[in-house]
Amino acid sequence: MVKKRQKDISGIEQKIISLYAKGMTTRQISDTIEEIYGFEVSDGMVSDITDRPLPQIEDWQNRPLDEVYPIVFIDAVHFSVRDNGQIRKLAAYVILAVSLTGHKEVLSIHIGEDESAKYWLGVLNELKNRGVKDVLVICADGLSGIKEVVNAAFPQTELQRCIVYQVRNTLKYVGAKNKKEFANDLKTIYHAPSEEAALKQLERVTEKWEKDYPNAMKSWYKNWDVISPIFKFSADVRKVIYTTNAIESLNSGYRRLNKQRSVFTSDTALLKALYLATHEITKKWTMPLRNWGRVLGELEIMYPDRLS
């Protein structure tokens, strides 16, 4: 590390990019560099340096992808962006996949405010244009029109409602004093050994709580067709599908961006920060998922001729 007041600035650009990836504004970075190195770096210079990865970002967003991914997750993180003096709420849609080797990979990041079926068809068609021919399971929250779009883009693909978000949405209706007990009751549904057993638990949980929280369980019945696919899988496969450690590790990094700055100056500034944060997080993703050999073996049996 360069000591304070030392004039050797080798590595300073990488330091600036690293600070930007942590969510610092150009002003905060300028102040930090002055504190560490003892000389001023203008906001404009910081901005120029953080613009340098833009060609890499474009290449990354357009890079060829594998032909087949066993599991793909779609997640959204929300940010505020300034546009002509107005503050817009935008979502960053992160497409995360598990490859045939069991490694996690961020396929793309899309920034937008439109969640229409047309928007999602464009997102999935972009994956196809980059080489993806098949996905076994897509896990997503209740995104508008996603079911119809998945059927159109990847007709053989199974849509699985994200269990973690289903649970979170349910618990929004529940009082603080009952959240823990209610959450444990919900586990009896999605940990059930079969769909038949899960439906019995669904009825039991609904009857137990409907007097106090009449709206809490409605979405389970409404979304059952996209919740229920998980019950045909073993515990190993289920764990991959409803354990969102990879998504959560990404989100924790993205949330740091929101903590550091409440508003991004532009869509480009947000995309730069997301890409650089993603790069830092995914550098640690060197190992395949636990028990991936067993998971892949089961998927090959359940989806014959689609993983070869």
Question: Predicted regions: what is each one?
Answer:
Residues Q6, Y37-D43, N62-D66, D83, ...:
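Conserved, non-catalytic sequence blocks in retroelement Pol enzymes and Pol-derived host proteins
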Residues M1-K7, R52-C139, S144, E148, ...:
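RNase H-like nuclease fold core
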Residues V137-S144, V149-D185:
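Conserved beta-strand -> loop -> alpha-helix junction used to position metal-binding or nucleic-acid-contacting
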Residues M1-K22, G38-D48, A117:
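Basic, short loop/linker segments at the boundary and entry of helix-turn-helix/winged-helix-like folds
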Residues E13, T26, D43, S47, ...:
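Amphipathic alpha-helical transducer elements in NTP-driven molecular machines
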Residues M24-I71:
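Electropositive nucleic-acid engagement tracts
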Residues P155, T188-S308:
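Acidic/histidine-rich catalytic cores and adjacent linkers
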